[in-house]
Design a protein with these regions (language model features):
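Aromatic-lined carbohydrate-recognition surfaces of secreted/lumenal glycan-active proteins
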Residues: 37, 109-119, 175, 201-240, ...
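Aromatic- and acidic-residue-enriched segments that line the glycan-binding/catalytic groove
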Residues: 75-87, 119-142, 182-196, 242
Length: 355
């Protein structure tokens, strides 16, 4: 299996960028990235070998690995000075560099996933960076998660430092998730310690993206960003600060989370979009790709969606997973990443590697 040319991609800021943002010089991957997602727990477990087998026997050519546990605690032992200062007493993955070496030995690439603005663990160490309610206690979304202020310089620097840590460990790409404001819960009760409440949320997220491009991308570290699937439709920031054309220039790849189960009833005429995986993704990508095509060529990132491989809204089958992959291919996507929170993927949906 050929290792995608992720580590070889250039992410150099150019001086001829349009006003208001910096553009990236991009080099296309040698082949589309086809990845599956692993939690820190799965990476540390005996099941890790089964994912290495996927790299050797199937079309999968990359593994996406969380750098943080679900609560935000670092899931590994840091090696760089800025992150060592935040090292936990215990960590889930005991031998992360060795795991990365094993991925490379199997012919795959390693992608580090960083959940940025949703992080309970960091908020406990730096309470001044967390969103709060009027009484001063941490604000929580509808699921109970704590969020950090997207306008906080310390929080943004932490993301930059983690990206540098990932590159030092040997990861080929850094994937940034939760680069947005909260979308649910008692939003009007949030007290922001840094955001002034008047700067548009899209501008706050844009400033984060610009910092990543400058402090991470220009150092030759390949980057990708996860965005709501509906960002390929919505013309505004959807109240969370994610606007397609605004974010596009700053990352090598955008990863819209086009899980059909996450679309509301009635989308594209479907009572239950989860039961129409090809159509939902086809229409989403077609719409977004047209918008991206209107940008200057140097501002167009690769599009590599997150696809659904879990049961929500419908019981997913091999054929339904495969249908999503076909929709990506039909719309010129640069591969895909499969999401299953417990790492149980439909192996029959993954084509065998050609000899």
């Amino acid at each position: 299996m050929t290792l995608p040319a992720i580590a070889l991609s250039l992410s150099l800021l150019t001086s001829g960028a349009a006003a208001g943002h910096a553009s990236l010089m991009r080099v296309a991957d040698a082949e589309p990235v086809r990845a599956v997602y692993l939690t820190t727990g799965l990476t540390a477990s005996s099941r890790f070998s089964t994912y290495l087998d996927l790299l050797k026997t199937s079309e999968v050519n990359a593994l996406v690995i969380d750098l943080k546990d679900p609560d935000g605690r670092l899931g590994f032992r840091p090696v760089t000075a800025p992150i060592r200062a935040l090292a936990p007493e215990r960590y889930t993955i005991k031998d992360l560099p060795r795991k990365i070496d094993a991925i490379h030995a199997a012919g795959g690439s390693a992608i580090a996933r960083i959940a940025v603005f949703q992080d309970h663990w960091f908020s406990e160490r730096f309470p001044s960076e967390a969103l709060r309610n009027a009484s001063g206690v941490p604000w929580r979304d509808s699921i109970g998660y704590v969020w950090l202020d997207a306008a906080s310089p310390r929080v943004v620097q932490y993301a930059v430092d983690l990206a540098h840590e990932a590159a030092t460990l040997g990861f080929d790409e850094v994937n940034f998730d939760y680069i947005r404001f909260p979308s649910d819960g008692a939003l009007k009760k949030i007290v922001y310690p840094h955001w002034d409440g008047t700067t548009p949320k899209t501008e706050v997220v844009r400033q984060f993206a610009e910092t990543i491009a400058r402090e991470v991308g220009e150092r030759g570290i390949r980057t990708s960003a996860d965005v709501f699937g509906m960002s390929f439709y919505a013309l505004d920031g959807m109240g969370i600060g994610q606007h397609l054309e605004t974010l596009a220039p700053y990352f090598d790849a955008l990863a819209p989370m086009v899980y059909p189960s996450h679309y509301g009833s009635g989308f594209a005429g479907f009572t239950n979009p989860a039961e129409a995986p090809y159509d939902v993704i086809d229409r989403t990508l077609e719409h977004g790709m047209k918008r991206l095509a209107e940008l200057p060529e140097e501002d167009r990132p690769a599009v590599r969606p997150w696809l659904q491989d879990f049961n929500l809204g419908a019981v997913y089958t091999d054929a339904m997973v495969r249908a999503q992959m076909q929709a990506v291919a039909d719309n010129g996507g640069a591969g895909w990443m499969l999401w299953n929170p417990v790492g149980r993927y439909h192996k029959q949906a993954l084509r065998e590697e050609s000899p």
